[in-house]
Amino acid sequence: MEKRALFRSGWLPWLLIAPQMAVILVFFFWPASQAIVQSMQAEDAFGTSTSFVGLDNFVTLFEDPAYVESFKVTAIFSVLVAGCGIALSLVLAIFADRVVRGALFYKSFLIIPYAVAPAIAGVLWVFMFSPSIGVVSHGLRQMGIDWNHLLNSGQALTLIVVAAVWKQISYNFLFFLAGLQSIPKALIEVAAIDDAGPLRRFFTIQFPLLSPTTFFLLVINVVYAFFDTFAIVHATTEGGPGRDTAILVYKVWHDGFKALDLGGSAAQSVVLMAIVVGLTVIQFRYVEKKVQY
């Protein structure tokens, strides 16, 4: 039976949640409403005049080949970040769940990237992959790979994917490790008695029980790749070479603060907001229905 808290005063629950509601109103709903209004306006570069243009900014946006290309780059980037990040984190969590000696150091070491700011993470990786002084680029040259992400768009995309995956790996690792440790050991021991090997035990017992965690992390990682990687891209490639790594969130900033197209930039932010709302709905409505136990 579900228990509910009873309050003598009907206004007390509302009073308790009022501070949080105020934060949400000021820092989410107000900026979101401002972006929607601004996306339907055209403003000159000096901000002296504003005119209502309706949906013209959205029409111009989807007719722009650069925006369509940015959408494609973002889709590829998101798939790579989510796929590689989840797979690598799961492998590391499996090792952490089994390791005995040095377990505390191993787990602490894997949590460190989460404490690093995205901009700092981008700077660290751009130094390591620097064509002139980078340790990693030097090692790649020793292997016969001519690394220069400033000129090669494929290498630039690889760089931002690696940096983004490294930054998010701690978050994924913690959830997978918690999920693995919550699985009853008796199930695994029974499977071992039935001569099931490690791989079979993982794919028939552990991975199906981790499906809620995996689905949750899939949505979170896609949202992360779409919205929380601006600092990494800005610190590593600045959307280059050309605009080959200009993901959507970076293009919002570039068009708004560099090109001074405030209406177009606001329209792009509204599109991004619609994407995150859609992903959130998928997460909360289907996470219970689509997972396999």
Can you describe what each PLM-predicted range is?
Residues 5-293:
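A structural signal for multi-pass alpha-helical bundles of membrane permease subunits
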